[in-house]
């Protein structure tokens, strides 16, 4: 099985945390059930046990394909809407190395999309956008326990801190507006209302 297709990192991790990764075939089959949402740049995805990002990486790949088709004629537009696609992805994992790998994997997916077409080249603002994308993944892919809805330390032990997600929206032009939401409050209410912050 290819490195990207391995389903476990070690037997010890399976015993300790029940960690098993979903193979690409299953990821695609499940995401195809909600295909329209995976191709909607604005649709939000939360993976409560994101591992190193198998699901989120494929969702981002699909969203970037849509961005390339719609906005690939303008580097500036492509950067803006590919950035927006990144802001819609959220993940939680109890393993610190998985969180770091997921963030890096998603950033590499976003960064790797440049140069895939004659028009999709980094704009003059690319470095700023790249820093913003990294910041989004730092805020959206979190070290935590989705069952207890709390942050965890580097050893997976619950802390007395709730998981807080950040919603990103364009206010005007390229200005961003952020709102924070507690995971437990979102689940308690069933669904967050747009713009409803904690």
At which residue positions do the language-model features occur?
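SAM-dependent methyltransferase catalytic region
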Residues: 2-198
